[in-house]
Amino acid sequence: MAAIVAALRGSSGRFRPQTRVLTRGTRGAAGAASAAGGQQNFDLLVIGGGSGGLACAKEAAQLGRKVAVADYVEPSPRGTKWGLGGTCVNVGCIPKKLMHQAALLGGMIRDAQHYGWEVAQPVQHNWKAMAEAVQNHVKSLNWGHRVQLQDRKVKYFNIKASFVNEHTVHGVDKAGKVTQLSAKHIVIATGGRPKYPTQVKGALEHGITSDDIFWLKESPGKTLVVGASYVALECAGFLTGIGLDTTVMMRSVPLRGFDQQMASLVTEHMESHGTRFLKGCVPSLIRKLPTNQLQVTWEDLASGKEDVGTFDTVLWAIGRVPETRNLNLEKAGVNTNPKNQKIIVDAQEATSVPHIYAIGDVAEGRPELTPTAIKAGKLLAQRLFGKSSTLMNYSNVPTTVFTPLEYGCVGLSEEEAVALHGQEHIEVYHAYYKPLEFTVADRDASQCYIKMVCMREPPQLVLGLHFLGPNAGEVTQGFALGIQCGASYAQVMQTVGIHPTCSEEVVKLHISKRSGLDPTVTGCUG
């Protein structure tokens, strides 16, 4: 035993990490990688255990290939960590949608009395109960992913991987043990993490991000959300919806990259339903008070004046950065965009190194959306191992922002269509409508709005659809198929609606912005 310990110790007397080299046949991984034409350990190695990476790995395994996944979650600055599944499962789509649902249920409970239900008021929300239920569901998904990998004989390594050369990575697990892996093909699918404003004193010490909010055991209380991204507005929306005092501070326009008329309606609805907005403001300092509350100092950019407010929680939602900095990409020869550190890829998802690929949020110019990463991952595996040549189509990708009044869209925004084709060649059909469910409950529907962006010349190809209202994701998904197939305005108008639904208002759009007529829908059977 003493001899083993002595062998593990170097001249410094410290323990060296053990290296476990996985082999195929008699040659080690490092030898296989360095020898020209040497056998590799795996047909495919996926770095990153998020939605895109797992989809790619499972598809390749289904096609009979030897596959490995290397995944490791670096705890957030607040110490939050989670299991296999990536951002969407753990700190994104899934917990966000469930907490959004919790907020919607609060509104339904308030509506219930209008429908004859005798509900004691005021209704109280229990953050602990909600958080525990959401976290338990997330953990079940973590376990499900592990089982799926095992069932498909995908080798899983919980290691922080980085490149040694273009065919080899090494990774360190949380115990400090080093594992070295080689593969013929490597897919980078490491995703991204929330950005901290390092120029704001106290931001890192006292703030949290979307990596933390869904794993809080106690209610965040009075919350300041800093940012104008969809993450900022979604989080602020459900926090307000469950009864918390919530303020959004944003430097410039909300939902940059989305249709700006729709973005304005989203924030108008949130503001009219209790979320406060500090527009054109930037934080400069956060300090913790003796009461454990956070005192935030900010500047109004228009006036140059400073102001101060006190909050229980500050949530940063100012954007995301790709997880590429610790991959040692230069050792593999993989090129990144120096401005944002995203990996440059071609239509095949290939990087500057032909057998190394990148998919999902880490890839330059790709939508940061779970479904696109999943589809791109599956198609990549099919091209590599299934004799397919089908490329991912990144045009007309639908998405939904799960704010209190949901915003679904597919295709071009009005601004994009005008910039691409010119104002004189664009026709926009639009309508304000009131969901039937809002009528009895006497809910405000002034921001429920639809617009369809079309070419003006026949056959009036539909370029984009924008829907603001209940169940926007469900509505948009169906129309996305038509737009992907090249539907015209005339074809949409020939479609019979399902009555009474919100989605039928799309197939009844007949007033154009150019006409100047009132777009408000009156009656329910017109």
Swiss-Prot record:
Residues 1-36 form a transit peptide. There is a cross-link at C524-U525 (Cysteinyl-selenocysteine (Cys-Sec)). Expressed in liver, kidney, adrenal gland and heart. InterPro entries: FAD/NAD-bd_sf, FAD/NAD-binding_dom, FAD/NAD-linked_Rdtase_dimer_sf, GSHR/TRXR-like, Pyr_nuc-diS_OxRdtase, Pyr_nucl-diS_OxRdtase_dimer, Pyr_OxRdtase_I_AS, Thioredoxin/glutathione_Rdtase. FAD binds at residues 43-72. Keywords: Disulfide bond, FAD, Flavoprotein, Mitochondrion, NADP, Oxidoreductase, Redox-active center, Selenocysteine, Transit peptide. Its EC number is 1.8.1.9. GO terms for biological process: cell redox homeostasis; heart development; hemopoiesis; protein-containing complex assembly; response to hydrogen peroxide; response to hyperoxia; response to oxygen radical; response to selenium ion. The active site is at H499 (proton acceptor). Disulfide bonds join C88-C93. The modification N6-succinyllysine is found at K81, K177, K331. The keyword Mitochondrion applies. It is found in: Mitochondrion. GO terms for cellular component: axon; cytoplasm; cytosol; dendrite; mitochondrion; neuronal cell body. The active site is a redox-active disulfide bond. The selenocysteine residue is also essential for catalytic activity. PANTHER family: GLUTATHIONE REDUCTASE, THIOREDOXIN-DISULFIDE REDUCTASE. Homodimer. Involved in the control of reactive oxygen species levels and the regulation of mitochondrial redox homeostasis. Maintains mitochondrial thioredoxin in a reduced state. May play a role in redox-regulated cell signaling. Belongs to the class-I pyridine nucleotide-disulfide oxidoreductase family. NCBIfam families: TGR. This is Thioredoxin reductase 2, mitochondrial. It comes from Rattus norvegicus.
